[in-house]
Amino acid sequence: LNLKGLFKKVASLLT
């Protein structure tokens, strides 16, 4: 599980 990808995914959902 890559935190970088996960963070970007969450950020994309929040934006």
Swiss-Prot record:
Coiled coil: none annotated. Expressed by the venom gland. It is found in: Secreted; Target cell membrane. One of its GO terms (molecular function) is toxin activity. GO terms for biological process: defense response to bacterium; defense response to fungus; innate immune response; killing of cells of another organism. The keyword Membrane applies. GO terms for cellular component: extracellular region; membrane; other organism cell membrane. It comes from the Eukaryota. The keyword Secreted applies. Keywords: Antibiotic, Antimicrobial, Cytolysis, Fungicide, G-protein coupled receptor impairing toxin, Immunity, Innate immunity, Mast cell degranulation, Membrane, Secreted, Target cell membrane, Target membrane, Toxin, Transmembrane. Signal peptide: none annotated. Linear cationic alpha-helical peptide with antimicrobial activities against both Gram-positive and Gram-negative strains and against the yeast C.albicans. Shows moderate mast cell degranulation and leishmanicidal activities. Has a very low hemolytic activity. Induces an ion channel-like incorporation in artificial lipid bilayers, forming pores with relativeley high conductances. Its mast cell degranulation activity may be related to the activation of G-protein coupled receptors in mast cells as well as interaction with other proteins located in cell endosomal membranes in the mast cells. Belongs to the MCD family. Eumenitin subfamily. This is Eumenitin-F. It comes from Eumenes fraterculus (Solitary wasp).
